[in-house]
Every structure is written in C-alpha cells, then in structure tokens.
Amino acid sequence: MTKLGSAFGEKYQAKRKDLLTRLFVLNGHTFKVRIPLISESDAIYKKVSDPDEETIEKIYQEITAPLRQFENNQTEDFEFINDDILVEGRSMREAAKNKAITEARITEFFKLLVPEMEGVTLDDLTYADIEEEFPIAVQMLIVEKIGEVISPTYREARGN
C-alpha cells in the first residue's frame, strides 16, 4: 500500500480500482479502461514509437513478397534499391515500420481494456488476437475511444 493509499483508508482502497478506470460505450457495449500511470504511459509511448527491427523485418517480408516477382522487370512503379523496394516512390521498408507502429499502438491500447471476467488478463494479448476479432476500422475506433478516456480533458488538466 502506498503512503497516500494508507492515508485515504480502507474505503479508498476498496474503491481505488474504480477510481483508476473509466468507461466508454460503443454500440451499446460498455468498455472499461484502466488509466495508466505516467511510467506506464511512457513505456507504451516508447514501445509504440520504436518498434523492434525483427517485427519491422517480418512485416516487410510479408508486404513485399508479392512484389519480388517484378525484381527482374523493374519499372518506374517498382524500383529495387539495396535492401528496399520502392513502389511509386514510396519505401516499403518505411511502410513496414509504419504498420509495426500502428499494430503496436493498437495492441498496447487494447491491453488497457479491463476484462469483464474476473481473473482474466490481456497482458499477453497480441495484434493477431485483435485482428482475429475486429476489422481495422473497429480497431481504430476503439483505440480512439481509449485515447479519449485516458487523456485528461482541458478542464481536468486545468483543474477547474
């Protein structure tokens, strides 16, 4: 128990979990979201903004596999340069990194959801699990809603 937790007493301890969660409703379903501590938010930001090279490489291989057939027939649309493929001037390695960032953001935000069933955890949730359940449009909508409830509003930040 923390110093503040002790000072606020047993009733506070009983309600602490509720204090650190917020709700949002999406199509009639109520989702609970755990508000991350600052250190957790920092860790999420780091994980999202700097995906590991192994993940980027895996995604790169997946998205460029169909393009490899054009390696001997390069055109202005498909250009093979060192360790990258440019499609209409756009780097597929950069596209893979952006996809890794998006998937990490979605996964880390979904891990903030509080399961309804007692004893269930989302700590080991993967993007594949999320993708299996929701199309990308719904994933992005849920992430947007999570972002809204975990970010303080101007009024809350100002203290009025």
Model regions and ranges:
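Extended acidic low-complexity intrinsically disordered regions
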Residues: 2-16
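Short acidic-hydrophobic surface loop/beta-edge motif
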Residues: 20-28
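Short, surface-exposed, charged amphipathic helix/loop patches that serve as local interaction elements
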Residues: 29, 34-160
